[in-house]
Swiss-Prot record:
Belongs to the dynein light chain Tctex-type family. Keywords: Ciliopathy, Cytoplasm, Disease variant. The gene is DYNLT2B. This is Dynein light chain Tctex-type protein 2B. Its main location: other. It comes from the Eukaryota. One of its GO terms (biological process) is microtubule-based movement. It comes from Homo sapiens.
Amino acid sequence: MATSIGVSFSVGDGVPEAEKNAGEPENTYILRPVFQQRFRPSVVKDCIHAVLKEELANAEYSPEEMPQLTKHLSENIKDKLKEMGFDRYKMVVQVVIGEQRGEGVFMASRCFWDADTDNYTHDVFMNDSLFCVVAAFGCFYY
C-alpha cells in the first residue's frame, strides 16, 4: 500500500522580464527593500490560497497527473507572486501533493537567510481525494 507524493519547485528572481531588459542597470548597493516592497506573508498566503482553491476545487488524485500538476501550480503561483511587485526578491515556491488516505505527513524546511528582509509563508489545501502543501520563500536579492 504505497503512497505516491509529487514534489515540484519553481524559482524566479521576482523581476518582470520587461524590467530586466530596460537597459538601465539596477543599483547594487541597495541593502534593504523599500517598505512597500517587502515580502508580506499574509498577502502572499491569500494569493496562494486563491490559486489553490481555483485549481484544486474539483481535482481528483491521479499518480500519473500529479507531476504535471505540481509543476503547473508552482509556476502559476511564482508568476502571480512576481506580479505582486516584490522587486529584487528571489521567489522559491515548493508544492507537495499527496493522496488523501487519512495518514499524517510531517514536513520541515530550514533556511539560511537574512531575518530582516527574507520571509516565507505556507498554505494547505485538502479535499476528499488529495492534499496540497505550498511553501513560498521570498529572499531579497542584494
